[in-house]
Amino acid sequence: MGQKVHPRGFRLGITTDWQAKWFNEKNYKEYLLEDEEIRKVIKSKYAQAGISEIVIERPDSERVVAIVKTARPGIIIGKKGAEITALRKDLEEKFNRRFIVNVEEIKTPEVDAQLIAENVANRIEKRASYKVVMKRAIFNAMKKGAKGIKIMVSGRLAGAEIARTEWYLKGRLPLQTIRSIIDYGTARAETKYGTIGIKVWVYKGDADI
């Protein structure tokens, strides 16, 4: 049976970057678990902000820099920066470290794989037709400049008795070409029939390497 390598891990350091930019041999486990908790706190607090990823840097043992990439930065920043200040204080109290929170706007969320996956999951949870949702997401991505896109859903689709997998592909998707810029995202839709998994691949062109 064929096995597929993770699109992000396959290209780390070439066309994709790390989500954690630090190294500490002594406290590696502690920092790794803390990173996941930081991401969980921010994502749960701003679930409506369209957060694609959170990159964490640690200049030293006392400071943490969280770079939040979002489609709706205004929700996180708040009026006159009040919301982001409150977030920083909450994180400092919870983790007992100094925090710097930077927000980066995602200009074209229609071609961001993680945001596409979460949007598809959200629509499926609201009982929209998964076929219509997938086709619309593909149309919007191609319209905004994607070179290719694949969306795959797995589970008891439309309440079927037997779980199955369906996918739609538009354009090119050269997964084995290492210079290809492939964005990858996953999400889950919790329905009354069970969990539906969503995977999204977006091909954005080739890097000059």
Swiss-Prot record:
Membrane spanning residue stretches: none
Q: Which GO terms describe its molecular function?
A: mRNA binding; rRNA binding; structural constituent of ribosome
Q: Which GO terms describe its cellular component?
A: cytosolic small ribosomal subunit
* Recorded superkingdom: Bacteria
Keyword check for RNA-binding: yes
User: InterPro entries, alphabetically?
Assistant: KH_dom, KH_dom-like_a/b, KH_dom_type_2, KH_sf_prok-type, Ribosomal_S3_C_sf, Ribosomal_uS3_bac-typ, Ribosomal_uS3_C, Ribosomal_uS3_CS
Biological-process GO terms, alphabetical: translation
Instruction: State the Gene3D superfamilies in the record.
Output: 3.30.300.20, Ribosomal protein S3, C-terminal domain
Family to which this protein belongs:
Belongs to the universal ribosomal protein uS3 family.
What is the stated purpose of this protein? Binds the lower part of the 30S subunit head. Binds mRNA in the 70S ribosome, positioning it for translation.
Cross-referenced HAMAP family, in alphabetical order? Ribosomal_uS3_B (MF_01309_B)
Protein name (database record): Small ribosomal subunit protein uS3
The species this protein belongs to is: Thermosipho melanesiensis (strain DSM 12029 / CIP 104789 / BI429)
Q: Which gene encodes it?
A: rpsC
